Amino acid sequence: MIRNLLNAIPAGTSRGQFDGKTYLVSKSIHNAGRSIKLFAEEAGGDDFVSLNFYETSHGESLKPCEMPAEKVLTFLRGYEPDASA
């Protein structure tokens, strides 16, 4: 589930929309795709989302950075990358 949400966001740096606001997103992929780091920052605002994602033999593991998992999941479910991304 989380993997599918992350796959909808392009690797590298991109822009998109969440909750009517523009976000700058940086997504990096490591370990042959088994590890993903994502940082999103509201353009002109103070909101941000930060996470690490791991896919192991035991399944998916979401590790939010200094925030509740629900905030991260809400962002991933609602974020829409710009068409040019």
Regions found by a protein language model. Give the residues of each.
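Acidic, aromatic-enriched beta-alpha/helix-loop junctions
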Residues: 33-73
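Intrinsically disordered, low-complexity regions
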Residues: 13, 17, 45-46, 60, ...
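Short beta-strand micro-motifs enriched in acidic
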Residues: 28-30
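C-terminal partner/receptor-binding element of secreted or periplasmic proteins
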Residues: 74-81
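The AdoMet/dcAdoMet-binding core of the Class I SAM-like
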Residues: 84-85
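Negatively charged, low-complexity tracts enriched in Asp/Glu with abundant Ser/Thr
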Residues: 1-26
